[in-house]
Amino acid sequence: MTTQQLKEKISKIIDNFSGIRVVFTTTANELKLSRIEGSALNSIAEGFIDKIKEDIINNEDLTSPLLSNFDDRKNALFKFDYEQYPEEFNKITQAIAIPPNSQDYYNPLNKFTDVKGIIILISGDNKCLALYKNKTNLAVLRNSRKMFNLVPDPDGYLKQLPNEILRLDFNYDLFSIGEDFYIKNHKTLETQMKFHQVIEAQAVIALNSLRDSLLIEDISGLEKSSREISFARKLAKISKHSPVLGKIDTKTIIDYVSQHKYLSAILQINEAGDKLLIKTKTSQKHFIKLMSDDYLQSDLTKIIYMSIAKDRLDE
């Protein structure tokens, strides 16, 4: 789905808005409906719709790259494209499926201490846009030794607020539409949703593909490095996007390395001449770049470049 198609799909839901639900996910791994007064619920819907228009529909600079190609670009919603999903994604799907007549409400006597996240379901055009926001420590205002909440009464006196307040702003960390998930706040994915487990699982897929390719004589060095999350990310990325791994035969790769003016001095080949020796951190680094096809040579100047951003001109 292109960015424009995503905008159009969301616009149809917003333009044909038919209702909103707010669902809490709890530390007990449960979903609980909120009971919010009608006018307040309308204000919540209006706030989130305005935010969606600002972030997505009216954002001319918006892009929607794949999450496995994550970088620090602004105005981006990263489409989740890994095989393994965080548990929170399943909760979003389950929240969408809650029957309209469900009475399974959140108990406010728990004072929001057991709330883990908030799912906002915006319905329209017989479809649902599901926003997810992680509950932060600042989301609940409560009296404590370090914090005292005061509110004015009708006579102008400040009185202690006896109850907790749930503060709900209109930011969100990710959303789902149809079967697709888009990430807005990558930090929440990293710190709250055990995303490292997803990365590690994808890295295992890359290692299995490399093992099956018979391209490397001893893969144990890569396996050891894969325990570091930074390197696991690189393996995960080539498992998804390598134009080399699984597409170019081993002999062609070996011949390319042996004849390459730069790589031939960095990547060693075994005595039989049919496998690469990838043992050092340096060789691992350049092997990953080889699998990403980052080494490019100008036909005009014959200069060899290392290019991470490759915008194809033949598509």
From Swiss-Prot:
InterPro entries registered for this protein in UniProt: KwaB, KwaB-like
Phenotype upon gene inactivation: Cannot be deleted in a Kiwa-containing strain of E.coli.
Leader peptide range in chain numbering: none
Top-level taxon: Bacteria
Keyword Ubl conjugation: no
GO BP term, example: defense response to virus
Keyword field: Antiviral defense
Record's function text: Component of antiviral defense system Kiwa, composed of KwaA and KwaB. Expression of Kiwa in E.coli (strain MG1655) confers resistance to phages lambda and SECphi18.
Protein name from the UniProt record: Kiwa protein KwaB
Source organism of this protein record: Escherichia coli O55:H7 (strain RM12579 / EPEC)
Taxonomic lineage from the root: Bacteria, Pseudomonadati, Pseudomonadota, Gammaproteobacteria, Enterobacterales
